[in-house]
Amino acid sequence: MAVLGCAQEYRAVIHWRGGSLPFNSPTVSALTSVTWNRTVNDTSEAVITIAKGMAGADCCEQLGQVEPFAHELSIYRDSELVWQGPVLRVTESRTRFTIEARDVTEWLARIVNTNLLRYLSTNPADPRHVGPIQEIAETIIRLNLEGGLYASSPDWPRMLNYIVRDDDSVDARFEKDGTADNEIWIVPILQILNDELVPRGLEYTTVGRGLILGRPQTTADPAQARLTLDSFAGDVELVRDGTNAASLVWVTNQDDHDITGSQYGVSGVVSGYYGRLDHLIRTQAEGLSAYDLWQIARASYAGRNPVPTSLRIPEGAGLATTAPVSIRQLVPGVRIDVAATGMCMGLSQPYRLSDVDVEWRASGERVGVSLVPIGDPFVGDPP
């Protein structure tokens, strides 16, 4: 059985862009602190601090040459690569170097889309065909990184070979073009993912150099781990909160001042237990069909019915070293079951892992996690 354990050593390596050719590796004794995280539908960060007095003259000289985006930071927990991404900022004081970096999705935030966004074709040979939203996301990334007028070289961030997909069972149609159908949406690729594809059911995260394009997990997916209260070091709180509960989710593009020609999408099942409990989402996005609105409603339904019970882990607490889960299994988005025996709520239910926050110093390692309610698999047909 896998256990979290306690890291015996952390190691940081500065690589050239692409993450494979080493530039510098501070000695373990010079590395005084490491923080890194993993998150879902956002860009994670890492920070290392190096004591100049223990780094040596040669290492110090190389550290002085570290350049944002020309170099990348790689973090190893014992021998396992746990985090990697481009350097964002280097700060030097009299006694230490601090290097801040962001994960590989930062490259997508720095690359502007130069391709038409019209995924309506039913021909599988057409790269821009109707398909799972995860496939559409990968195609958008691939078409922008493979080359083109403004590319310094094909796949210059070295991302395409590290994309992993977990496709949805429902096909999506996606279009973001002007009235002439030949206009390109000039925005960063990451904005396309966040503003258009995540609401339609995309869920992305990074592990090491890998970019995972997945879907929200449900109770139908297998659990990566099963935890109890003994798996946590410190206090925990159970919160049953109806603020975001719903048996039906509605999405509309209706304007308060003019409702002519508006459409809506609805997802869910009226509950005999809660009755009809609605949640309304308004979108100002243009050109959305009823199917598009249904996609957004479907993606937003997860975790609302039944009323979610959250597991809160106060700041400073984290997983115990005996927790039956490995760092490799702590991938944001996966299902993790928790049994809170001994609590009045008698909680035993599945969750989704939303964040992993790790801090290492000479005093030891702390691994914090955030767990959010998970939804049942959707049952129903599109409009």
Label every model-predicted segment.
Residues 28, 74-102, 205-207, 337-370:
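Short beta-strand and beta-hairpin "edge-sheet" elements
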Residues 66, 70-72, 182-186, 333:
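Glycine-centered loop/turn motifs
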Residues 1-130:
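Beta-strand-rich assembly/attachment modules of structural machines
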Residues 63-68, 115-120, 228-232, 368-372, ...:
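Short intrinsically disordered coil segments
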Residues 2-22, 118, 126, 130, ...:
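Acidic, small/polar-enriched beta strand-loop surface segments
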Residues 36-57, 95-107, 251, 305-322, ...:
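Oligomerization/assembly interface segments of phage tail-like spikes and tubes
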Residues 52, 103-105, 208, 255, ...:
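A mature extracytoplasmic/lumenal domain signature
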Residues 93-96, 102-242:
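Charged- and aromatic-enriched interaction segments used to assemble
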